[in-house]
Amino acid sequence: MNIFENAKWIWRDADAEKEEYVFFEKTFNCDPERVCLFIAAETDYIAYVNEKRVSFNQFSGYRNEKYYDEIDISSFCQKGENTLRVTVRHEGVNSACRISDGAGLIFSVRENEKEIAFSDEETLSSLSSEYTSYIVRHITGQLGLSSTMDSREKKEEKKRSREVSLCMNLLPRPVKPLEILEKRRAVPIETSGRRIYDLGREECGYLYLRVKCESEGLVRVVYGEHVTDGCVRYRIGGRDFSLDFNCRAGESYFEQLFVRVAGRYFEVFGDTEVLEIGLIPVLYPLTEKPIDEKIKGLDRRIYETAVRTLRLCMHTHYEDCPWREQALYVLDSRNQMLCGYDAFFESDFQRANLVFISKGKREDSLLELTYPAVNTPAIPFFSVMYPVAVYEYVCATGDKSIIPEVVDTMRGIMNTLYGRITDRGLIPNLPSPYWNFYEWSDFSAGHNELGNNAPRAEKYDLILNCAFIYSAERFSALCEEIGESADFDLDSIKEAVSREFFMPESGAFKLSSAYDTVSQLGCAFALLVGLGDERTLSFVRCEREGVIPATLSMLGYVYDALIKSDENAVEFVLDDIRKKYSYMLEKGATSFWETINGDSDFANAGSLCHGWSAMPIYYLNRLL
């Protein structure tokens, strides 16, 4: 069945601009029996049937592949005439979560598979009166634009629409729709003259607001994860975590469904009485596995908080952090996937994300930084670890059917990096625009590379080359499962790694060909690929002076290296988890942080909920 057999991509009869909101209206007649709405939009949509909301939250696609939602609207329909109204937001900017690809709406209404209404030029459209168009104000570069709602009286002039040219390769939404939970009301807290409201814990969802104004005016709601400064810290560098509401005189009620927010606190600015403020929480629908009885006391608190952290970072796809970025990264999601096999019964979300990532290829066959996105400062280390995530999925689920779907992407990554090996037998750091990042620590973050297009001196990094070996071993195993081969001379790369980075006088591996700095993560990766000796273990345990400790995101590789190489590793790993994660709990964490430095990191932009920090789930299940 061609679902969109007569439907066209449409927009109002004018060229679309950035941050434009358009509503569309179409009437249809039905019995009704089984009536379904098939719908997709660029950038996002909210759909209503007979004034009742039936769906929102577009799954963002690539330029050559879009995704549609299928919604059973039978219970919203009546016999005879019905009205479909759709508000569409065209954001018009690239971000870490979306690719700007024009403005448009396409839909088909079907009763018992017969098309009874569809998007075409006869569909009425107008600028939306519920949103203020053309206010281009970024929340963050990763999230994209903020949004302004409007309750003032404005006339909507409905006219015919026009057809627009957008991709007709439309596939079903690859993941389930979000689960909408009961509203969570924020309560005012005692402050010195500021209107601050507390949700009680870290949450993620959509803001709702009821206010009363003496006259028309602007109300601004800002949101954040803490009140360390005695207020909600919402302007951080170039970031602006705020939503605006143009209010009429009297009472206004808003539900802002175009911007998903996260945090714990709201602060309200403007000449208004706040009647109610809170969040409509949303989570990806999952069934949590019972926690093993052996996980008790502090370990159980850590485990439960880690699961909560995972849930807050799963919506249309995995997210690094729900507050600041909401972006899908390979390395962040690899940690989330690994923990999810233990935390939840389902694994369809992991599979869908792995397949979706595989489509985010650059011209040179490496992966973009996030998905869907274009022209990103892509990270080679993240690309090379993609086969590892696929391998772990196959091991955890037994589902080998994913391998043929993503093998070309994996092979492209591995062949591209292998083809860059120089006469020193190693993969060099990649030139601009690549970002040679490994973790947020000294000498591993590539800070000086972001936005710097100047030529770079040839340099070799320990972690990239060890990660290639680590990934190639797993990629080869995946290839064997489908009768293919992967031919890489890993022994030669190992010899080159030892020759370039091993320091025989200490047993450590230096991070780079450019300096002798040693990190816990670098030595851990050396052990993971079979290099080093017993002395290297002391650096992985951070028992030697000057070793740069691994950050929360990379602790899994440290723990794996110790478990592989040290018969006494179990207590070390458990003690390390308890020390680091109890510290966050003692500081009031209701989800686990991006780094152990909390909100003060990244020039006061550290996230207090980050999916990559859920790793205790994996180790508590195995080591207790």
Protein language model features and the residues they cover:
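Extracellular/oxidizing-compartment recognition motifs
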Residues: 1-320, 332, 348-349, 353, ...
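Active-site core of glycosidic bond-cleaving carbohydrate-active enzymes
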Residues: 92, 328-344, 348-624
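Phosphate-binding glycine-rich loops and their immediate beta-loop-alpha structural context
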Residues: 325
